[in-house]
Structures are given as structure tokens and as C-alpha cells.
Amino acid sequence: MALVGVDFQAPLRIVSRVQFGILGPEEIKRMSVAHVEFPEVYENGKPKLGGLMDPRQGVIDRRGRCMTCAGNLTDCPGHFGHLELAKPVFHIGFLTKTLKILRCVCFYCGRLLIDKSAPRVLEILKKTGTNSKKRLTMIYDLCKAKSVCEGAAEKEEGMPDDPDDPMNDGKKVAGGCGRYQPSYRRVGIDINAEWKKNVNEDTQERKIMLTAERVLEVFQQITDEDILVIGMDPQFARPEWMICTVLPVPPLAVRPAVVTFGSAKNQDDLTHKLSDIIKTNQQLQRNEANGAAAHVLTDDVRLLQFHVATLVDNCIPGLPTATQKGGRPLKSIKQRLKGKEGRIRGNLMGKRVDFSARTVITADPNLPIDTVGVPRTIAQNLTFPEIVTPFNVDKLQELVNRGDTQYPGAKYIIRENGARVDLRYHPRAADLHLQPGYRVERHMKDGDIIVFNRQPTLHKMSMMGHRVKILPWSTFRMNLSVTSPYNADFDGDEMNLHLPQSLETRAEIEEIAMVPRQLITPQANKPVMGIVQDTLCAVRMMTKRDVFIDWPFMMDLLMYLPTWDGKVPQPAILKPKPLWTGKQVFSLIIPGNVNVLRTHSTHPDSEDSGPYKWISPGDTKVIIEHGELLSGIVCSKTVGKSAGNLLHVVTLELGYEIAANFYSHIQTVINAWLIREGHTIGIGDTIADQATYLDIQNTIRKAKQDVVDVIEKAHNDDLEPTPGNTLRQTFENKVNQILNDARDRTGSSAQKSLSEFNNFKSMVVSGSKGSKINISQVIACVGQQNVEGKRIPFGFRHRTLPHFIKDDYGPESKGFVENSYLAGLTPSEFFFHAMGGREGLIDTAVKTAETGYIQRRLIKAMESVMVNYDGTVRNSLAQMVQLRYGEDGLDGMWVENQNMPTMKPNNAVFERDFRMDLTDNKFLRKNYSEDVVREIQESEDGISLVESEWSQLEEDRRLLRKIFPRGDAKIVLPCNLQRLIWNAQKIFKVDLRKPVNLSPLHVISGVRELSKKLIIVSGNDEISKQAQYNATLLMNILLRSTLCTKNMCTKSKLNSEAFDWLLGEIESRFQQAIAQPGEMVGALAAQSLGEPATQMTLNTFHYAGVSAKNVTLGVPRLKEIINVSKTLKTPSLTVFLTGAAAKDPEKAKDVLCKLEHTTLKKVTCNTAIYYDPDPKNTVIAEDEEWVSIFYEMPDHDLSRTSPWLLRIELDRKRMVDKKLTMEMIADRIHGGFGNDVHTIYTDDNAEKLVFRLRIAGEDKGEAQEEQVDKMEDDVFLRCIEANMLSDLTLQGIPAISKVYMNQPNTDDKKRIIITPEGGFKSVADWILETDGTALLRVLSERQIDPVRTTSNDICEIFEVLGIEAVRKAIEREMDNVISFDGSYVNYRHLALLCDVMTAKGHLMAITRHGINRQEVGALMRCSFEETVDILMEAAVHAEEDPVKGVSENIMLGQLARCGTGCFDLVLDVEKCKYGMEIPQNVVMGGGFYGSFAGSPSNREFSPAHSPWNSGVTPTYAGAAWSPTTGGMSPGAGFSPAGNTDGGASPFNEGGWSPASPGDPLGALSPRTPSYGGMSPGVYSPSSPQFSMTSPHYSPTSPSYSPTSPAAGQSPVSPSYSPTSPSYSPTSPSYSPTSPSYSPTSPSYSPTSPSYSPTSPSYSPSSPSYSPSSPSYSPSSPRYSPTSPTYSPTSPTYSPTSPTYSPTSPTYSPTSPSYESGGGYSPSSPKYSPSSPTYSPTSPSYSPTSPQYSPTSPQYSPSSPTYTPSSPTYNPTSPRGFSSPQYSPTSPTYSPTSPSYTPSSPQYSPTSPTYTPSPSEQPGTSAQYSPTSPTYSPSSPTYSPASPSYSPSSPTYDPNS
């Protein structure tokens, strides 16, 4: 509710901890309001007291009231009742715990079974301080072994010995009863106890069923100390409470009855269940009272037990589910809580909200990107509560009078006491009267801030802030560029809109979540939006070389460009008629000084090198220099979504707001051009010429013939299988290769045939729609259809469709589509095509569910990880995850890809380009000016400085090559130096041919100073220093190498001014790029990883023609990694070799054989069993010869061998391949079977390799007896054969089933070495890849590189190499998965995930087994999975949740400590009282004037110098405006009409005259950018618009009588009366006391140190504020302080403003507010007593003046200077209108200074926009001093006579 605090006056406490526990029977009775004892609900049509709908438990129907609290249906929350059970029963949720505790204590005396004082126990208690769950587990493990309650026997023996012995004392206490313990088993919902040993109880049976009653007795005997030892809590969770004796009856609100029309009420499931319990309970009581048989009672108790159990959980395994009469299972309490739709996830974590709208979206290219068009019907329905203040009462009164029926109206008035007046039902006129403090719920109007969202919300750019524009009709309209972050299209998508209900929310959305602020995504540091669709297509067409635009059309286009400055550029062609090129028009759209180099999509790489690399014949090199498109065709590479493109650069260089306008302007102008130009596509575009078709047919015919040939070869067995593949795989690969090749060849010939003007092609080339493949499929041939990565499989009887013959492997039968879409498919082709398409659809559907779950798990695992104020990254338990975010402490949004100039070049080039030689005079003279050369020659340490620079560069290069041994890493850093240097060259007009005046010594010292300022980790201790070094190492290396002396004097040629500007710019941009504390980087990382996962393919196929090994990729691999799976689909090692093995394939083969597991089966050709009784004379003819030779020297006793013979013939080829010898195999057989098998074998060189094996039997004598159970020899031999073939390992590692050997052809697997010359060289070593992993065994092999060899099984890496290695392995594996399909995710997100998974020192899986085993609070865990189990566990162990995380706070409806909620604000409430003085005499006087002191919400009262935002809250940029509407802007009076530009409030930037009854425009023009009294052109007496004779300003006009307290009139400025207490005679904007602006603000004076006239755009403290940039004017209304573009040089921040008074962070302590003190206290160092402005002799500063206190420079009416007749411009009066701080003696404003004439302190007469007469022009602006280089007096645009161009801001100009 937006109205908390209005409706409910009671203050709300913040929940700081949540204590879990079990409700004990006493407490249940205490909180109960009714004892429920009857199962009936009604009696005589009335709710029955003591029944299940007891009226004391809550309200029953709409009209009723609650008997307990007398509330009605909306107010009464419901109250618990209770019902007492006749017998105790088990609580099903606690059953497992009950069992555990039974096993820990003695069944008879309730003692712990272990000695509490035993060291083991004490250690456990110490170890598990707060973790009681762990404690129970460990104690339970100790007790499990005990079967006797110890202590009885020892007690008797020990006593006589030594009664004083402390041990005995302990024994006495610990002594148990010495009886044997039963073992317990759970059966269903019963517990059975069984005694194993013969118990000394004579009659007791050995096995009984424990009743809950008996267990309760045991539990009641446990002492409080023991309760603590078993991890429970005597106060909150006692063991006996786990047994139910009293049941709470939930309130009626929890189980409402459903009233169906025409029939009785349907009671809720819980009510039914409770009624069953009561009935059973009554029956049990009756039977007990009547003394029924024991078995009857037992049955009743079991039934009661069943009902109580199913009330809690209705899905108990082994129990029937309780059902309603109809057979529908009842919904138990557990089912109500768990799952997506349950209470936790469905109602607490996520709720349905009010003030939201949903409808279909439609495109509208004319809306700005941050605007959404809202239908009027929605605007009329959604309201915003606006607080009535004296400033907006008129406006709101008007809305209220219109009511709800007319559009800009209001729905409700909410009075201060919370009463609502509904304006729909014609209320009395008196009710409509508004008073300050009321709230008006007004309709949504233009300019409101809303949140727009499209599900699925995969990343933070799926919910962004927009502004509203009310449009007719019924759909949301949005700009096309914004569709990409939302992933929306206009084929019927719906989107949601939320209207925030408080100013704080609006401010937050506006300052953080608006679309322009999200242009760059931290996910991949690139823009998320680009130009799309028709605009993209047109921008390519328009920027081609041959596009010309004539004069009328040019005028038309300029009309569409809002930022046009009124100058038409020189046309490119003058005769015969003026023509402009398309490039010129595009240059007009580009804002400001941007420099970009890109290529067009068709750019050939060959053009980038060679002597003519600057010449681009196809106009494919896009060069934008100084905001001018010089060459190149603009396509999606320049204005799309790629990193480093034009849009990216504009956003980084000029700020998000200009970038946002740029998006909109491109669209309006280009679309206007396209409407005239036209773009269409038809069948004509798809038709190629005759020759092409012939070519295509021939290609396909040839391909089909090739396939037939391959099939022939396969039939004839001529096809050699490729290594690692079977014959069939090889065949398929070959065929696939042929067919894919055919498709590609036909496609490329089709594309070649299309002309330059083909519309298909123009869309593909510009990147707006389609790809090359689409073209070739439409024109040439659709190609091979695949299912599961293979050709269409045979369906039945060896055919794909009935139309083909059996075993047809031809292209047509297996799914090759040779027709194009244009020609149309044959029926069978169509069928195959549909098969391929269907698979795609299924894949997508399955993938969506998979990735959605992955995303949820990632978010849940990392949701509370955030950057803290100490710069570390921690989770909600404040456990450190990273020392610095992303290891460099920078925000992913501000970094860019940069290249390290020193990494790649070899030594010679490196020395040539980076080594400076100060002794080379010729070089110095050529590159440096005389002064510099002299300085170098005179300096004594110059040479050593330059030498130290060189050695530092060499060291940097060595480090770089160590960090990036491959030399090709993508280095991501802030501040793109190359571009900054380029900007500097443009701004300072650097001439690259002249020598420079920048001394090399200055360069070295400058760079060193700068690198000291780039602080990520502050602190002077050793650790901090090292951390700082690590975090900024790369940045420093980049700085030193790019800004080295040699580079500066030969390539960049910056002069010293430019160099200083550059250093300052780097520093401020680096500061800006530091990650903000409070940033929720965990959620960001989870989204950044989850979002690309949805784009991945689900199944990765074994691609055709690849013989290398197949690895799991895509979503399945991602799942394996984050689940930390123990068993992978394709476990694999990548083995790198060293020494000779790496180079020599034979040696590599040796290693391969050592690794690959080889069984006998793999080398066997065939086996056979023969009956061959005589060993010497064999029956097998071919063996005779070698057998007889073998037995010539008999060394065995042949009499015992069996007559059966196993003959194994081996495959010679495979033996050689595996490098095996016969001897090795014989050894293995001998090793396996010993002497039981008699083996003979042929020589290695024999024709056939044969083994002959016989069983060596025992002596004949023994054999007879055992004959019975012995199997026959031949059967036994068969078993041996099977065993030998499969299990006999010949060599290798059993886990590694196959090893592939290959020589890598891609660089990522090659070995990169650094040559002696210092260059990089990649060497293709042999590498082995395996199926199966055994890292430990492999690492111990010889000739293996143990450093690079790695496994893809992260569990194995953890076991073998430890946690740090596995962190790197996860990072590498994740990177492989993501980059496989060309995505890129910034390293910091991957690193964060790896750190979260490994921070604890073990692998934490991102599943319930990992996330829910952390020590976070129970509330967070139960919001993920296993809801009820976790809550039960928490109750048993009396856990406490500290409510620190995100989920817990959301569940409790509190602000989570994250983002803007992670800090507190200090507010001086006393000061706030003086914040807003509203003179009572003007409150109802037609217009309202507020003092300019500032409301409490204004920035002057905000925490002044929190280190991050140099002293301003993000919300209110204005000086003083009312909390609701921002009615007062710093200089622009009150605006009754909302949305005009100017002013400073973000909402209605109004600038109207305070009260002007007649003129609709008021005294100010509606768009004036907040200039007050004497501000230029607003109230100047001679200005034609506001002349004294103007009817509205006649002194006789009733509302302007000079003495009227409301609107007095001074002779010059009609609206200021001297007696009006709040209006000072000078305009508030330029008054000396106005904190927001003082003309002497040092930032603009030529003497100011920070504003050097030669360096217009840089002041040391300003991140990127350049006065020459058109939109950063002092008056630009929408600039927030945290915006990078605000800077101390903006007038609102003048250093004299109290916010910056150096002696006090916010304002000076002696000044209660800036109405009365303005922060200028005498102790403030800027105001010394000698300052001429405050001289005591000044006539206006009389200490005796009643209203002038020395600390408060107020204007008081009694001050002599301020009589209405006071001369307006009194040069001698330091307090005249002329200048509040002007005095003739002031050194800055000396009358002799040419720029300052006495009548004009601010504008010099030479400034082209200034005329020295007091009537100032509208265009004057404090920003331009005559010396400012960017502002030349001759510039025709800013002529004094041109009324509408204010140099400060073309958009918001005073007079338009």
C-alpha cells in the first residue's frame, strides 16, 4: 500500500531476527481463543460455539464481526483455537528427529547414552557452537554405537575406593540405569522398538510398537543440559513438544469456506481434516471412558495418528492419501507451503501487485527510446498519489474538480486522517476542498516515470524505467531499438507496466533504471540496443557514396532533427544545383566530438595491410572523426549492438542522455529519408540469371554423383576408415561433407549473381534481417536435413519412407533437399524438412525449461552477493567472496576491449617504438621544440629518468607475457586510451607534422603521478599495497606503454596542455568506472550467465567430418559444471607432451599406447576351442610346424594338461598399432592365471600370430574325487576365454578407454613460444585427448607435460590438485561452454560464480545440495527448495535467522540491505523545520511563492559527503522545490502546468511567472530554462516581450499592486515586492545568498584555477563535463548529481554553494538553514572579513539593521538599499542589482579590466552574445568566456540577434 503511515498511525518496527521453535501445548492453549470440541460447523443455521467455525476465531461472512477483536472481514486477521487430543500422537514432520533423539537417550531413564564430560563430547560441543543440526548428527553418531545405558556397574565398584575422587563424583552424576537399549525402526508412521539381547524384564516381549505416549514419557525425563547437548533448546524447542498433545486450530481466514451459488457452503480441506480429527478424538474418548478392549483403543489411536499426520502432510510414502468424498486428495498444510504455487514462493516471495497494466505492444519509431506510449484508458485507471502543498494546490484542485470521468483528472482524495473521498460518485462540493497535507490520487500523465517489463525477465534490462506519453487507442507503443533488451517483437507480445507510487521510488528509477542508463550492459561491456529493422537497412542505403539529397528534401530532413543548430552545412555539390550527400546528413545527426574507426560488414580483410591500406575502394572503412562521417558505409557494425561501435562510443564519451537522443534522432531522420526513398522486396529479388541456375544444377548433379561413388567404394570395401571412426561413421562423414559443400557452393554462386541493388542483399549486408544462408536457401538449394545431428534415419524396414528402396543411402532418400524454397520442395523433401523443423521446435521447448531452472538456481546461489563499502564482495553472512569485484574493482559497464601495444611486437620493433634516446640530437630536434630540447639538455637526471622508463617498459612486457602466455588475450580496461588521445588531438587541434612542446620528463612524471591516483585499494600496509598493485597492474601497464615518451612525441604529438587534459580525463574516467558499493553483483553475474544459456543449443551434435573426440557442450555441459556432477557424459583428459614425444608422432604413439586401455579382445582376430588330445602332434595343420619346434625342448610336464585347446589368433596390424609383443601378452596371461594355464605362442615375426592355451590339470589321482562339483574342461575353457578377452588388461589405464592423437590446427591448443627475437610463435605439438579420465595416473607418466595436462572433470581436479586449481578449471570450462557459440561474457561474472562455488574450500554445487547446505538463514533456504523440511528442521533446532539476506527481507516485506538500501541517511530534523517557509499571506492569494530556501527533501539537507557521490542524494537536483511537485525550481518560479522544460525538478520542469492572471504563458515563456529576476531576457525592462507597458504588468493591475504582499513590484522586475518576505529583489537564481548560483562562482572566472581557458572541457574534478558540449548547460533540467556529466563546474554546484563549504560537510553549523544563513558563516573560509562583498562599511550591511545578523546576508525590507525607489543599477553599491558580489575594489571585477564593465559583472562586452545595456539577451550564458577556444565570436550560429540559440543548451532554450 502506498498509504502506510497514513492509514496506520502506529509506527512499524523492523524485524531484525526471526526465532524458530516448536509450539508447546501450553503456548497453544495460551494463544487460543476457543476450545474446539465439536466437528459440526453450524447449529440451527448459526455458527456453533466450540465448533469448527467458532465465531470467536474470526469473521464468517461479509456482514458479521469477529467476537474476539470486533473487526470486520478486512480488519480481523483471524485467531487460533485449540483442540485437546485424548492421547498424544507423533508429529509426522518431526518423526525422523524423534527417532534420532530416542537413539541418543536411555529408553528407561531419559539420560544421554554418552558421558557429557567425555573429551570427545566436549570437543563436539565446542566445534558446533551455533550449528545445532551438526551437533545432533555428531552426538547421534557417538550414541548409535552404545547399547547399554552406562554408569550403573561402575558406580558400585567405584564408590568404596575413594569417595572424594572427583571422577567418582562425575560418575555419580552421569551414571545411567545400566539397562540394555532397544533398537528402533520406523514403519510408516509408527516406531517399533526391539531388544536384541535377552532383557532381564521377564515378561516383556522382545519387540513392541512404541506409542507416542511412551515416547513422551521418555522425552519428559531429558534434562535441560541434555536438551542443549542434542542440539535442541529448552526454551523454544523441547523434545517432548515434538509429540502432539494439543493441536492448534487455524483461524477462519486461513480456511475460508467457498460459497457456491444455490448450494451449501463448501468447507475448506483443512476444515474437513480437522472435523475428522475431532470425530476420531471423540470416539477415542468415549471408548476410553467405557473401558473398551485394548486393541480397539490401539486402532482408534492409530486412526487419530493417521488423521493428524495427513493434516500436516498428505503425501507420506507407505500411507494411503486422505481423500474427500469424491476421491480428490486433500491439500495438507505441507502442500500449501511448498512449490512454486505455495505460500512461500507464490505469496511471500512474489505477489500480484496493484498499479500495473498489461496489453499488447506496437512499434512507434517516433517515440524517444525512453518513452512508452500508454493508452488513455490505462492512464485513466492508474493513479499516482500526490501530496497537496501550497505550490500545487491549484493544479490538483483543477484535477479534483474534473473527477474521474474526464481524462486528466483524479480518482480519490485521501485526507490527513486517512479518510478516502471517492470522486467517481459525485461527492459534495465541500468534500472537494483541498488542504496542504492531503493526498490526491491523480491520473497518470505525460512525463510520469514507470517501470516496463517483459517476461521472461532474464536480465536486469528486462525491467527498465520509461517516461509516459499518453496516446490514443489501446496498445503500448515503444521505440524499436528497445525491443532487443526486452527480447520483444510485435507479433502479439504483451508487456507489463508498473506505476511507482512514491517520489523516492520515482527518483530511484529515474536515477538508476531508466533506459538510457542501461544502454551498455555489464554482461559483455557492449551496448544492449542498436538500430534495427528498417532504420538499419536505410542507414546503410543512405550512407552509400552515390546518395544525394536536394535542397527541399534536405530542409525536410533537418526538420526531423531536433538538435539541428540552424546552420545548413555546405553542400557537397554546388553546380548545377546544390546537393548534399547522405553522409553529410548522417554527420549532422552524430552529436559532439566522437572519433570512431569501424568497418562495413562486407569489408575484405586484405585491404587492411599493404601500401594502400588507407584507400577503401568499396567504401567499407568507416571513419568518423570529430563527429563527422568521413568515409565508409554505416551498417550494423557501426550502429548495431557490437562493442566499440558508434553508439557505444557516444554513450561513453558524451553520456547516456545524449546517446539516448542519438538513437531517437537517427530513427526520425533516417526514417524520413526512407519514406521518400522506399525499400521493398518481391519475388523479383529472388530470381537469379540463367547461367547461375545451370551452375547450381551442375554442382548438385556432381555432388550426387560423388555420393554414389562413395557408396560404391563402401560396398566394395575400398573405403579406409579415418582414425578413431568406424567404417559407417567415415562413410556418413564423407557424404555429409560432399553435400554440405554442394550447398555452400551453390549458395555462394547464387549470392554472386545478385546485383548491388538487390533488396534481399541490402538487408543482409546492412545486418537488419536475414543471413547469407537464407539467401542461398531461397535461391539455390535448401540442403541436407538433419535429425539429432545425423542424416534422416531409417524408420522401418531399412528405409526412410515407403517410397524408397531398401538400404538406400543416397542423398534423396536420406534427406538432401536439392530444390530451393523458390522452386518448391517435392513431397518427400517437404516431409524430411518438416522432420528437421520439428526437432528444432522440441529442442527449443525443452531448452527453455532447462535454462529457466538453471537461471533460478544461479540467482538463488548468488542473490545476496554484493559490493561492500570496503570494496570487498561479500554474501549476506558477510563472508568474503572476492577481495575486489572482478579482481580489479571496476564496474563491467565502463570497461572496453583494449590492446596492449607492448605485448605482440618482437624485440627490435619494441625497442624501435618504445625506447627513447635522449642522446640522439637529430631525433630530438625533429620531434621537440627548442625549449624542450634545451630543457632536456639542461636537466641532470633526464637520461636516467628515460632509462628507468625503458626498464619499466621491459619489465611490464615480461609481466604481460607471463600473465598472457598466449599473447592474444582480450584485455578489458576502462578509459580507451587510443580514443582519448584522438579526442585530445581534435580538441586541441594537434598538428601531427610539427614538433611538440611536451617534454619527455613531464610525460614520465605525469604518468607516474597519474598511476598513483588510480586507487582501487587504499591503505599503506603491505597487504593493501600488494592488493592495489595487483588490481591496477594491467591498467598501469597500459598507461605506461601507451603514454610512453617515444609514442607521445612520434605518434600522438600532443602538446603539454592536451597531455594534461588527457591525464585528468583518464583519472576521472577511471574513478567513474569503479564499482559502486551496494551493487548486487551476484544477481548480475547470475543473469549474465543465465541469459546466454537460453541462447545456447541444447544438444550438441557430433559435427560431420570431425574425427576428433566428441565433447559435451551447450546446456548439458553447463548443467554438469554447476551441478558438480560426479559422472560426466564425456569425461576427457587433454594430455600435452614434452620432449621428443611432442614433435615425433612415433614417440607420441608410445605414450598413447601407455595410456590407452588395451584388452586382449582389442587385438584378437578370432578364437576357437579344439579337442586336441596330443599336445605334440596337433590336429590343426597350419600350427604343426611351430608347435613341434616348440616342444623339441619340453620344459613342462605335458601329462597333466587338458586335451581341450583354446586357440587365439591375433591381428598383426592391431598388435603393431598398439606396440605389443607376443611375450608381453604371454606375461600378462601368466600374471593373470599363473600355472593353471599352459601357454605356447608363435614368434612375433610369424605369418600368423597364434596363442595356444591348455588348462594344466592336477594329478590324475586327486582329480577323481572332486569330479562331482567340477565343470567339464571345455566349459571351463570357454569361461576362461570370455574372462581373458574382456578383463585381461594388456597395457594402459583401465579408466581411459580410448586415446585420440592429433596435431592441433587452431591456436588455442598449440604451444605458444617466445622466439629469441621476442616474437610469439605457435608450435603445433602432438596432443592426446582421451575418453575417460585418470588424472593422477597420467600425471605420473613420463614425457607428459604435468603443467598443461588437464581434465574436464572438475571433481577429479579438486581431488588431485586442490581448490585453487578447480576454481581455475571451472572458469575455463564455463568459458568454453559460453564462447563455443560465439557469445562473450565479461570475466568478472564467471569469476564471481567460480568464487561462490569454491570460496568455502570445497565445491559447492549450484543445486539444493549445495545452496541449502550453506549456513544462511532458514528463510532463505526454504525459499529455494525443500521448503517444509527446512522449516521443520529450523523449528527442532530452534534456529535463529538474522534477516540479513535478500529473500528473508522480501518475505517480511522489508527493504533489503542492498542497492540504495545498504546505507542509512543522517538527517538533522531540527534543520528541516526551517526548510520550507511559506508566507501565510500568500497562501490563498492567487499564486504561491515559496522561499528559495529548500525543502527538507532538497539536496542541501542530504548527507553531504558520502565518498561516493560528492555530496548529493541522487534524487533532487533542484535547489528548492516542494516535496511533491517540485514547484519551485531554482530560478523559475512556480509552474502551474507541469511539463515544460527548465527548472530543476525532474517532474514538472516549469518556469512560469509566479502569478500572472491573464497571459496563459505567464511572465516567463514556458520553456525558459530557469532564469530568474535579472537573468538574461526574462525580466529585462527593455525586452520587447515583457515591457512595462505590457498589459499584464501594469502597476495598476490589481494583482500587482506594489504594496500587495502577494506580488509586489519593483521598478525593474515586475514580480518582486520589497515587502514580500520570501522574494528577494534580485532574482533568486542570481542572488548572493542563493546557494545555487553566484556570478562569481570560481568555476567560471578566468582566474579560476579549475577553468583554464585553454582547456575548455576539463576541470580536474569533473569527470566529463565540457562546456562546449551543448547539453550540459547550467539549466539543463534533468541532470542528476550522480550523473557523470555533472560536475562542480555546473552552476548548481558552485564552490560557494553551502554544500561545498570546506569547514562543514553540509552547511555551516552556525547557520540554521540557508534561508536564514545560507551557509555563509563567518567561519567559512571563503568569506574573510576583508572580502569586499561583506565589508562592514557596505551600506547594506549594517550591523544594526534589525534583520541582518552578521551571519545571515538576508535582504530585509528595512535595509536602506532596498527601498522600491532604490536605483536599480548602482555600481558603487556592493549590493545593487548589478551584482551581488561586485564591488569596485574587488580585484576580480576591476573596472579597468576590459572584460568587466561596471554594469556587467558577468558578461564581457566583447562576448558576442552580450550587449552592455542592462537589457540582457536571452542567449547569454555564464559558460563562455571570450577566451574559450571553442567559442569563436565569428561563429554565425550564436549571433546576438538570433533569439533562439542559447549557447548553453540548444534543446532547452529560453524563448522557444
Swiss-Prot record:
Give residue ranges of the sequence repeats.
1593-1599, 1600-1606, 1616-1622, 1623-1629, 1630-1636, 1637-1643, 1644-1650, 1651-1657, 1658-1664, 1665-1671, 1672-1678, 1679-1685, 1686-1692, 1693-1699, 1700-1706, 1707-1713, 1720-1726, 1727-1733, 1734-1740, 1741-1747, 1748-1754, 1755-1761, 1769-1775, 1782-1788, 1789-1795, 1796-1802, 1803-1809, 1810-1816
Tell me the residue numbers annotated for binding Zn(2+) 1.
Answer: 66, 69, 76, 79
Q: List the disulfide bonds.
A: none
Q: At which residues is the cross-link Glycyl lysine isopeptide (Lys-Gly) (interchain with G-Cter in ubiquitin) found?
A: 1260
Q: What GO cellular component term, any one, is given?
A: chromosome
Q: Which example biological process does GO assign this protein?
A: transcription by RNA polymerase II
The knockout note for this entry states: RNAi-mediated knockdown results in embryonic arrest at the 100-cell stage and prevents the embryonic transcription of several genes. Surviving embryos exhibit gastrulation defects with decreased expression of genes involved in gastrulation.
**Protein purpose:** DNA-dependent RNA polymerase catalyzes the transcription of DNA into RNA using the four ribonucleoside triphosphates as substrates. Largest and catalytic component of RNA polymerase II which synthesizes mRNA precursors and many functional non-coding RNAs. Forms the polymerase active center together with the second largest subunit. Pol II is the central component of the basal RNA polymerase II transcription machinery. It is composed of mobile elements that move relative to each other.
Give the UniProt family note.
Answer: Belongs to the RNA polymerase beta' chain family.
Q: What else is known?
A: The binding of ribonucleoside triphosphate to the RNA polymerase II transcribing complex probably involves a two-step mechanism. The initial binding seems to occur at the entry (E) site and involves a magnesium ion temporarily coordinated by three conserved aspartate residues of the two largest RNA Pol II subunits. The ribonucleoside triphosphate is transferred by a rotation to the nucleotide addition (A) site for pairing with the template DNA. The catalytic A site involves three conserved aspartate residues of the RNA Pol II largest subunit which permanently coordinate a second magnesium ion.
Q: What is this protein called?
A: DNA-directed RNA polymerase II subunit RPB1
* UniProt source species: Caenorhabditis elegans
